[in-house]
Regions:
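Short acidic low-complexity segments
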Residues: 25-35
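Charged, amphipathic alpha-helical segments and their flanking helix caps
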Residues: 1-26, 43-140
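Low-complexity, acidic Ser/Thr/Pro/Gly-rich terminal tails and inter-domain linkers that flank the onset
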Residues: 34-45
């Protein structure tokens, strides 16, 4: 499975979720500053890739966020976004035939004030896939 195929699957999971209105793979801050986001939103990007003898591991940062009325509903928005993150993680974990997901997925709560007042959660998730590492597969 390629990185493109993984991104497509994760994008589909987000797009099919009834409480996510906008999904994007790429630089979160570029899109936030352009004002093209329909909240609640899910952004994700690749943070790290590592190759071992028989595996390749992709680590993604998944950001779940929504607008909040300034400083009044921060806890409510964070709570909702944690639940949405759990749903997407469950979908990703359900795809065990293609990758392995670790038991623990660290999540960090955040608040942003520019360009919108946002609250949400970032989940760091690693997907481990088999990799043959066979030089005979190199195109000639």
């Amino acid at each position: 499975m390629t990185l493109n195929q993984i991104v497509k699957k994760v994008t589909d999971y987000g797009s099919q979720h009834p409480q996510i209105n906008f999904v994007l793979y790429g630089d979160i801050y570029d899109h936030l500053s352009q004002g093209e986001v329909n909240y609640p939103a899910m952004f994700f990007n690749i943070e790290d890739v590592s190759i071992s003898a028989k595996q390749i591991q992709y680590t993604f940062g998944l950001y779940f966020m929504d607008r909040q009325i300034e400083n009044t509903e921060e806890l409510e928005v964070m709570s909702d976004q944690i639940l949405t993150a759990q749903d997407i993680v469950a979908q990703i974990r359900n795809n065990a035939n293609e990758w392995i997901v670790g038991d623990s997925i660290p999540m960090v709560l955040f608040v942003e004030s520019e360009p919108d007042v946002l609250a949400g959660v970032k989940a760091s998730i690693s997907l481990v896939l088999p990799s043959i590492n066979n030089r005979c597969q190199i195109p000639t």
